[in-house]
Amino acid sequence: GWVAKVGSANEKPGITGISHLFEHMLFKGSPRIGVKKAKLDDSIRGELDEIRNQMIEKERGYREQVRLGYGEAVTDSALQDDEMKALKKEFDALIEKQRENLVKDEFDQVYTAAGASGMNAFTNQDMTVYFIRVPKNKLEMWMWMESERLSQPVFREFYSERDVVFEERRMRTESTPTGAQDEVFNSMFWRGHPYGWPVVGWPSDISAITREQAASYF
């Protein structure tokens, strides 16, 4: 395996959880792995980013309406206008189109076909670790595979995977008896230090991270 000396302590408010999100994203392949048509995939990712940016602008307006007391949250159906509904519909259609162009879990399949097993990763405050067991005669292949995803990351299925991470947070924190209290205690103990925010990220940050922010952080 290998270790990247980057974890939640390297983040800043607004993008907490992004290191853990990368742990997920680097399993999505490269321009040559995990997709049928790379150019189509590039085009779809660009369109998704553009639509998402338009949605963010709309959400800023909704946030102002919430501040003025016209709603309780930016997701309130009463605040959603026809333009936002159309953007969401177009966004969902592109997500489905992207999925049809994917070769699901091809990165893992290549390794498995070569006799490898146990591929996994974890993130903490100071590092992100990727590991796998490979036959001793497949070391060159391992080097090629790992350099492929490090040198040519595509952040494929970014917004879908972001939702997966958000659900992981809910299971790890909100759905456990002491999860929320543990987070509060940790943030108080490490006041003013990056160790004070959770590795998985604050919910408001996870739901707002964009692919452009991810590319800049990488």
Residue ranges and their predicted role:
Residues 1-42:
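Active/ligand-binding-proximal structured segments within catalytic/core domains
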Residues 28-217:
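Acidic/histidine-enriched segments that form metal/cofactor-coordinating
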